[in-house]
Design a protein with these regions (language model features):
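Preference for extracellular/luminal or secreted protein segments
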Residues: 72, 94-199
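Second-shell residues forming the walls of enzyme active-site clefts
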Residues: 1-139
Length: 199
């Protein structure tokens, strides 16, 4: 589920969505549609959903949400990746490194630690230790590796328009139109910024 009914930002706090299962069904509708439409990847949220997960862990670390609901119930076969594990919703309440291991255990394929390389290195060591201790399943991590490689393969094969399309006359005209429409006149003075798209 997404941030639709949250009042806190997971960058700085741990949001909780207390909705009933019926209310949550409304928030899950876009995800059902996206999965049915063949979306290739879904990012998890660092939000507590007590109606869906009884163990007081956010969706990113919830096997009930990631594996049981997203994979099994919705049938999602694509890539599941976490939001940054250094966000306060994880870092302050569970710890970035422990959270990374828990996210992989929940069924997340790709864990994002995007600010501090040292935390990424610690997470790699923690994952290796969790594998050795049997906390993480080698089969699950192999499946995640397969999911990552499949996503890369699909993206590599995808037909992309040439970059020259970006600088085509239609795009330049749209850029100029948006440029002019996005300015707000604060004082009635002649337009002085010109047509340079950098302004």
């Amino acid at each position: 589920p997404g941030h639709g009914d949250t009042h806190l930002d997971s960058h700085v706090a741990l949001p909780v969505v207390e909705g009933t299962k019926e209310e949550l069904a409304m928030h899950l509708a876009p995800f059902r549609s996206a999965v049915a439409g063949g979306v290739m990847g879904i990012m998890t949220s660092h939000i507590l959903f007590p109606q869906l997960e009884k163990n007081n862990v956010p969706a990113t670390m919830s096997r009930s949400i990631i594996t049981d609901f997203l994979r099994s119930e919705l049938g999602f076969k694509g890539l599941i990746f976490s939001d940054c594990m250094e966000m306060d919703a994880i870092a302050k309440h569970y710890g970035t490194v422990k959270g990374a291991v828990a996210a992989l255990k929940a069924g997340v394929d790709l864990v994002c630690i995007s600010h501090h390389v040292c935390l990424g290195c610690e997470a790699v060591e923690a994952v290796e230790a969790a594998l050795d201790a049997g906390v993480l399943s080698e089969a699950d991590l192999k499946q995640s590796t397969h999911n990552i490689l499949m996503a890369k393969s699909m993206l590599a094969e995808e037909q992309r328009p040439p970059l020259s399309v970006v600088d085509c006359p239609e795009h330049r005209a749209m850029n100029q139109k948006l440029h002019r429409q996005s300015l707000t006149l604060v004082q009635d003075v002649p337009f002085a910024l010109g047509d340079n798209p950098c302004f």
